[in-house]
A protein has these predicted regions:
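Sec-dependent bacterial lipoprotein signal peptides
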Residues: 1-37
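Context-gated lysine
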Residues: 3, 9, 17, 46, ...
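Residue-level detector of functional hotspots within protein domains
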Residues: 25, 99, 103, 227-229
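An acidic-aromatic pocket/loop used at catalytic or ligand-binding sites
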Residues: 39-88, 142-255
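Terminal, regulation- and interaction-focused segments at domain boundaries
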Residues: 47-59, 99-144, 156
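Short, solvent-exposed beta-alpha or beta-beta edge segments that form flexible loop/patches at the rim
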Residues: 83-105
C-alpha cells in the first residue's frame, strides 16, 4: 500500500532527527539541525483558534472561571470586604517550534490556555484590624474558599499590629504590612493606612483592556463593571484591597 505524503514526511523527519543527533558535532551538524527544525513547527494561528473553540476547551474555561468567581463571591459574602471590581484576562497561546537550545518548554504543547483574575474590594481604614480579623474568622469557617484563618500565625500578628498590640509583624523596622500570601493560594493586598509619603504602598489600577484583547475564543479581557476604578473604590470606602489568583493554566494540549 502506498504511504500517504504526511506519513512519509513524519518518517523522514524522524530519520533526519536521528541522523542529526549523531552528527551534531560534525561539520554538517548545523545544516542538519536547521533541516530538522523545519519538521517541527509551532502551532499555526488557525489551529490555535480551532483548539481554543473546541468543546473540551470551552468546558475547561467555564469551569476555571466559575471556580474563581465562586471564591470571589464567598469573600464578598462572608468577609468584611465589599466587592467593587473584577478583572479577567483569558489568553490562548500556541506552542513554539522545536527548541534545540535554551529550551523554555513552550515547544512541548500545541496550545496552552491561561486565565488571570483579580478582584478588588473596598473597606473602612478606621477598622482595618477588625477587617483582617473578620477575614480570618471567615477562613476558619470556609477554608476551601478563604485560605487565611487564625491558624496562619503571621496573619494574626497583622491584626494585632493594627490594634497596636505588637510591633512590625515581619520584624523591627520592616514597617506596615500590606499583603497576606500562601503558596498556590490567592494573594491578598491592601492599601497601607499608617504609612505616609512616597513610601506608602497603594493598590494599583488594573491594566486597561486593549481594543485587540477581545477576540473570542482566542483572547478575552473583562473589567466588571467597566466604569469602576480602584481610585473610585478608595474614595467610596476609604481603602482598597485586591485578591489576585495565581495564573491558571486550565487547558493544555501536548504535541
Amino acid at each position: 500500500m502506498t504511504k500517504r505524503p504526511t506519513q512519509r514526511k513524519q518518517r523522514s523527519c524522524r530519520d533526519l532527527k536521528a541522523v542529526m543527533r549523531r552528527a551534531l558535532l560534525a561539520p554538517v551538524g548545523l545544516a542538519l539541525l536547521l533541516a530538522a527544525a523545519g519538521c517541527d513547527r509551532g502551532t499555526s494561528p488557525k489551529t490555535v483558534r480551532k483548539l481554543a473553540g473546541s468543546e473540551n476547551a470551552v468546558h475547561a474555561r467555564q469551569q476555571a472561571e466559575s471556580e474563581m468567581r465562586s471564591i470571589i463571591a464567598a469573600w464578598n459574602e462572608h468577609t468584611p470586604l465589599t466587592l467593587g471590581l473584577v478583572t479577567l484576562y483569558d489568553g490562548y497561546g500556541g506552542g513554539k517550534a522545536k527548541e534545540w537550545f535554551f529550551a523554555s518548554g513552550d515547544d512541548q504543547y500545541k496550545i496552552r490556555c491561561s486565565m488571570y483574575v483579580t478582584a478588588y474590594f473596598g473597606a473602612d481604614p478606621n477598622h482595618i484590624a477588625d477587617t483582617i480579623d473578620g477575614i480570618l474568622t471567615a477562613g476558619d469557617a470556609n477554608p476551601a474558599k478563604i485560605p487565611f484563618n487564625h491558624d496562619f500565625y503571621y496573619a494574626t500578628q497583622v491584626a494585632k499590629y493594627y490594634r497596636g498590640e505588637v510591633g512590625d509583624p515581619q520584624g523591627p523596622g520592616t514597617g506596615e504590612p500590606a499583603q497576606l500570601f500562601e503558596a498556590t493560594m490567592p494573594t491578598l493586598n491592601w492599601d497601607q493606612v499608617r504609612t505616609n509619603g512616597q513610601g506608602r504602598r497603594l493598590i494599583e489600577e488594573p491594566n486597561p483592556c486593549p481594543e485587540a484583547s477581545n477576540d473570542p475564543p482566542v483572547r478575552r479581557c473583562l473589567h466588571e463593571p467597566a466604569s469602576t476604578s480602584v481610585s473610585e473604590l478608595r474614595r467610596r470606602y476609604g481603602m482598597a484591597f485586591s485578591l489576585t489568583f495565581p495564573v491558571r493554566d486550565y487547558f493544555v494540549v501536548m504535541k
